[in-house]
Regions:
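Flexible, processing/modification-adjacent segments and terminal tails
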Residues: 2, 6, 63-132, 138, ...
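N-terminal mature ectodomain segment of secretory-pathway/periplasmic proteins
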Residues: 2-73, 140, 145
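Residue-identity detector for threonine
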Residues: 9, 31-32, 37, 55, ...
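Short linear motifs at secondary-structure transitions and domain/linker junctions
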Residues: 11-13, 20-24, 31-43, 93-98, ...
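Gly/Pro-enriched, hydrophobic low-complexity segments
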Residues: 15, 50, 56, 65-66, ...
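Short secondary-structure boundary micro-motifs
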Residues: 18-21, 29-32, 39-42, 47-51, ...
């Protein structure tokens, strides 16, 4: 977490698998890929294709832009001056949430350890992320998490969580690859694409509230 906290820029790819109940009983798995670029303290880009609508989020320190390229919708709102505050705003206004938020805030260790009840060392693994990892497990009042942390670079390679209040004990897993810390980021990386400028504007709001009414 010290490496993450001290990096002015960072990028990674996140591959998320989330279980969802099925009518037959056993859960189904839905997957999403995220391409994440961060420039602290006030720039963020998240591009997300997956088993559902593709989404893109851009934050430049002044505004948040959410773009749905397939539906051709774009939502824009004024935003506060830090990544953490902008992500809080995105959740409060539009229920936009990402499973890797704790990794990109200013103090990842504080975010990950908040409310910690128990933690223990499981052992080593050589099968995750193509590197040797330390495997740890920890729990708070909300979730039980197993984490694979690079033994040499101290970067998270896999996180696996079960939420304590979930009666079905569904599993949520994220593999994290392509880590790049401290590398230059192109000046226009945090600006929406040209297609977003031509998209249909909608309110930056919860999905059902923001979607335009269909023509009869």
């Amino acid at each position: 977490s010290d490496r993450l906290a001290s990096a002015r820029t960072l990028s990674f790819s996140g591959f998320v698998g989330e279980e969802s109940p099925s009518r037959l009983g056993p859960p189904l798995l839905y997957t999403t890929k995220y391409a994440v670029t961060v420039q602290r303290p006030d720039k963020l880009r998240i591009v997300s294709p997956g088993d559902g609508p593709a989404t893109e989020l851009y934050y430049d320190g002044r505004s948040l832009v959410a773009f749905a390229p397939k539906e051709n919708y774009v939502a824009t709102t004024a935003a506060p001056a830090t990544i953490e505050a902008a992500l809080d705003l995105a959740f409060d206004k539009a229920q936009i949430y990402y499973p890797f938020v704790d990794l990109i805030v200013a103090d990842p260790f504080k975010a990950l350890s908040e409310g910690l009840r128990v933690a223990f060392y499981v052992g080593e693994s050589n099968t995750v992320g193509g590197v040797r990892t330390h495997v740890i497990a920890y729990a708070n009042d909300h979730a039980f998490v197993q984490a694979w942390i690079g033994a040499d670079d101290r970067l998270p390679r896999r996180l696996r969580a079960i939420y304590r209040k979930d009666p079905l004990q569904l599993r949520h897993q994220m593999d994290i690859t392509d880590w790049k810390l401290g590398e230059p980021v192109a000046a226009g990386a945090f600006a929406p694409p040209e297609a977003a400028k031509k998209a249909l504007p909608i309110p930056f709001d919860r999905p059902q509230a923001a979607a335009p009414a269909k023509k009869p």
